[in-house]
Every structure is written in structure tokens, then in C-alpha cells.
Amino acid sequence: MYRHEYHQSLVYKTWLCGKPGKVVNTFEQVLDHIRRIHDQTLGVPQICYLVGWQFEGHDSKYPAWSQVNDHLKRPEDAHAVDSLHWLMREAKRYNATVSLHINMCDAYESSPLWDEYVKFDLLVREADGSLKKGGIWGGEQSYLVSKTREWAGGQAKERIDALLKLLPLAESGTVHIDVFQPMPSLYHGITREDEMATMKSILGYWRSCNIDVTSEWWHHELVGLIPMVYHSNFDEASRLKYPPGLACGGGSAWNMRQPESDSRPGGFSRLPEPGCLFEEAWGHSVDHDLHQDLAKFSEQFYLRTLPFIFLNRFRALSHSQTAKTYEVQFSGDVWTQVHIADRHLTIRQQDRLVVDGSNVFLPALWRKDREYIAFSRRGGEMAWTVPPEWGAAQWVHSKSLFNGGVEEAVTIANDILKFTLLPNSAIVVRPSDM
């Protein structure tokens, strides 16, 4: 159905540059991050969307996508677009797909397309005919593109086609469209329903180009057209309804049912659903852009994405909650439980504990071998039951995913693995017959 298995991948955004030209990561630095993530995750499939790849950085010059950010190029390349081609090509060595974070909703007066979009009346207008303002992003006032008028006029196809000529997105097979929500235009008589129909046409065109589209949050009308959103706003009923291979989500940054949600900036409460109470019980991944703190990002992989990939191999069957616990039952005899008082998460499969708070012992399911990853935030003495697929293993191999792959001591007795982990460290463990 989709080009990629998003529910079995580490999907994230990397922050390159804010406007005007405030560089955080160059294309070379991004490749180094990708390489290090590959080494620390046993080569998990990565899908990395670049934020701020264009013009002067994130949210600059929309609706134009015609120029790669010169601040990010390698010294040896003549043009920034050559450097981006290089990054997209080299990332494949690390089981990584690199693509773009773009926007089809916003327009700025500084854009080279501004005059054209005003001339052909492609912007959303208020009832009195004035241009409808969007947010102020990076110090610039944004206005809103009428997707319905832009699609009808052919300009949407034109800028998609031009982008596909500029960069090998068809080869990447995925793109992330920021925001991507219906924008009614009162002056033009364009309704939410009109916009939603247009959005489906736009997604259909991307798909005809063999490219998946991911976005920021869910609209129910788009399930089956979008494989994944960065901020998952599904409630419990929808998480039971949709299999993760059809519709999955990243993290919970905009989960409006979290206790701290009342302290966040308003605006996103208008989303179709408010989210669920304890998203970790269902499986959640990362949804904070990677800047340069790779240690924190790696911890999120072990504590979020690794359980996310594991739980997404099963179907959520039922959900229950008491005054003390919040539980989800999955197929495969898998159970998750959150202790409400301290939000302590446990995950079990056939009564075998595989996640205990910030201690994790889970299979690397993207590998053909029977390898497991163990991680601990606090460190200390670990004891985990030998996985049933290991059979009657008498001893194991293990090595650190940090410190250059140093061999780690692991003992096995009475079907229990025992070893010591330093705080915020991970090892890979495999049976001796491998």
C-alpha cells in the first residue's frame, strides 16, 4: 500500500536552519547523525525529513520550493542542490531515506511566487475580500494558500513537478507536508468540504508519482491516504480501529488530553481528536526534531521507538482503565500497563517482562537474526527471561552499542540473563549459535 513501513521505522525530522540563515546542521552534519544513529540502533530503517532545506531556512519563501539553502552546502560542491543530492545518496549506506519537510498551506510576501499567487487569486480571503492571515513564523507574517484554487489553476501540480525535477524525491518515495489542513475561503465560497476534497486530489497526485505523504496530525478523511503523522492525535477508539500498518503516529507532543496541555499555547484543540490518555501503552515514537543532542535522541529511540516497533507488530484488541492502571491488550498475548500514579510502563508477552519502566529488553525486529537490545536509563543489575525463540541457549554473545562495540559480560542460568548496564547505555545480545 505504501512505499515504506512507517510503523516499523524510525521516522524523524532533522532541524537544519531557521531563517534568516541560522544554521544548526549542514548536510554533512546530517549524514554524520544518520551514521551514528545507524550504529547505535543496529541499523534500524530511518526516514529523515529535512527542516529548513530551502532558501533561508525553515518557513522561508513559501509557496516556492525552487532553491536549496546555500548555507548548508559542502565546500567542495558548486551548488547546494549538489550537496543535497549527495546526502540523499549517501544516506542509503546506513539504511536511511532522506526527504523533505515542505509546506502547501503558507505564503509569504518575500516569496518569488507571491506576485503570481496574488495575481491569480490563489490565497484565502476573508468575507470582506481581505487576505486571511496565518501565523507569524520566524518573524514573518504568513498568509494562506487556497489549495482548492491552486489545484484548479494547475499551480499545485506545477510546483510539485518542479520539485521532483530538482530533487530525487520519487526515489526517496516519501515527503512530509507540514500542517496540511483544510483552509476555507469565505470570499470565494470555498468550504471545508471543498478543501478536504482537494487535499485528497493532491495526495492522489503525490501517490501517482510513487511518493507517500506524511503530515503533522490526523484528519479521519485522510486515513488510508496518509500512512503516518508526526503528532498522533488519535483517541483510544481510533487506535483500536486502525491497524498500525494503515495509520500510525509518531509522538504525543500535541496530545491535548495530557495533564500539562492547559499550559501549552492554544490553537490545536481544534484538531479532529484530542489524543489518548497514556500513549505509551499503545506505542509512540519520536516527534521532537533532532537538533544536535544525539544522546537524548538515542534515549528516545530505546524508550519509545523500540517498543513502538514491537507493539506495531500486533493489533490492539481492547483497552481498560481503573483508578490505578491503564491497560491495552494486543494480539500475540501482549499486554501493556501504565501505573497511573507514577506513569510506570510495563510490557509483557506471554507473561515475560520485556519493558519495565526505563529498562528495556526487546527484539531488533528489522534484523534477520534473533538479536535483542537492552537499554537502561538508570543502569544497574539487569535480569531478563531468555526469549523463547532462543531455545535452550546456554551462553550468549553481547556487545555495547556505544564505546566502539566493546564486548559485555552476560551470564545465563535457569533461563535468566544477567548483566550490568551503565546509565543511558545499550547492548545487543544474541544466542551463542549465531
Task: Map each language-model feature to its residues.
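Beta-sheet entry/capping signal
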Residues: 44-49, 95-99, 173-174, 210-214, ...
